[in-house]
Amino acid sequence: GDSPIRSPYYVTKADFVACHNPSYIVKGFKMVRDVKPGGTFLVNCQWSDEEFAEHMPAVAKRYIANNNVNVYLIDAIDLAAKVGMGKRTNTVLQSAFFALAKVLPAEDALQYMKDAATKSYMKKGQAIVDANHKAIDAGATAFRKFEVPADWATAEDAAPVELSEETKSAIAQQVKNLLEPIDRMDGDSLPVSAFMPHVDGQWELGAAAYEKRGVAVSVPTWDCLLYTSDAADDR
């Protein structure tokens, strides 16, 4: 139509959904439910097929199998590093999107991306432009289809580990009832009663240990010998 879309809500049934960070799978974010039956779900991860299956929650497995969702995996992290893009995976993943979603003819979409990259980065040098072009070409073909096992249709999560009486403390209940649902972006489903133990604003200490985001692909390490050498040279 001619009227702009001003809807303040997310699309809930999309033809294509992509998970750009594998930590969202581990945390149980319910992204798969936003894929319409027969749609496409792309996951950026460094996992093998077996590792991917191990990390997927049972509820997501059931939805994928029962709604014929097409699942594709891509390691944009490694690809970006190999073509000289460092940690910048967005170009690789955008290229994969155009190749899979088919909202435009793939060849046209990739050429548009290359033209935009040339225009945007030519001032930074030909090497930067070439790296972007390589990322575009790589992303268009580097994904692989994951064959969904038939038993995913009836998948069940492993039985939760029962906490001992000693560890069934207020902090454990707080994490289970509040922090975990909120952390996987499911906080809107919590009833008011879940917050009643904290109606006075008091919360148990120590919960930060359970709120690790886990979104970093790599972490820095400190070379104490190098630091000592530099410090000695400065004296």
Where are these regions (language model features)?
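Conserved small/polar residues in nucleotide/adenosyl-binding loops
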Residues: 227-234
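Non-ligating segments of multi-cofactor redox enzymes
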Residues: 149-221, 225
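Active-site cofactor/cluster-binding pocket
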Residues: 1-180
